[in-house]
Swiss-Prot record:
Domain ABC transporter positions: 2-216
UniProt-recorded Gene Ontology molecular function terms: ATP binding; ATP hydrolysis activity
Binding sites annotated in the UniProt record for ATP: 34-41
Protein name: Uncharacterized ABC transporter ATP-binding protein YnjD
Classification via Pfam families: ABC_tran
Family of the protein in this entry: Belongs to the ABC transporter superfamily.
Record function comment: Probably part of a binding-protein-dependent transport system YnjCD. Probably responsible for energy coupling to the transport system.
Gene Ontology CC entries for this record: ATP-binding cassette (ABC) transporter complex; ATP-binding cassette (ABC) transporter complex, substrate-binding subunit-containing; membrane
A single BP term in Gene Ontology: transmembrane transport
Entry-linked InterPro entries: AAA+_ATPase, ABC_SmlMolc_Importer, ABC_transporter-like_ATP-bd, ABC_transporter-like_CS, P-loop_NTPase
Keywords: ATP-binding, Nucleotide-binding, Transport
SUPFAM superfamilies, per database record: P-loop containing nucleoside triphosphate hydrolases
Amino acid sequence: MLCVKNVSLRLPESRLLTNVNFTVDKGDIVTLMGPSGCGKSTLFSWMIGALAEQFSCTGELWLNEQRIDILPTAQRQIGILFQDALLFDQFSVGQNLLLALPATLKGNARRNAVNDALERSGLEGAFHQDPATLSGGQRARVALLRALLAQPKALLLDEPFSRLDVALRDNFRQWVFSEVRALAIPVVQVTHDLQDVPADSSVLDMAQWSENYNKLR
């Protein structure tokens, strides 16, 4: 379970978010909706431990009954998928994925884990492929595989579908939701598009917390 408790974010001269509270159970996907600038991505930055220095924050982040906002980023065990795939083009597809694997996985098990993931995503045989030769949809799949191979205990989706064309977007979206639900981890996504919201899942309007919301609409 992922719990955001009484979180407020502010700049020196203004408040951005006030008293954010929500909980995501294992296997559930909660969607945060609101216009650009209302604080969605800033909240994600705080959750992963990458909040810009100009912001101050109060509140707590809990994951599986452990408070994690006081931990370094690497120890929080939260994965994130961005709009851009952010692959390392100097490495092959397989090398990109190997970088994500936990150090506890050794020897041939590392290569096998990557090949299994590629096969599951329809990219069998792409281990040695140059990421620059991949289509947008393929790059997006590799980015998700990289996030999941790190074995996160929770996952954040920061509008990962927004730059895909309509045909790719629907298929990739359904594949993402299937993958994360199979892992039974809590997921939070931000989006502007109601079509990105899974059926029978919760949607939270940023208006209830954002100080800028009404100015941006």
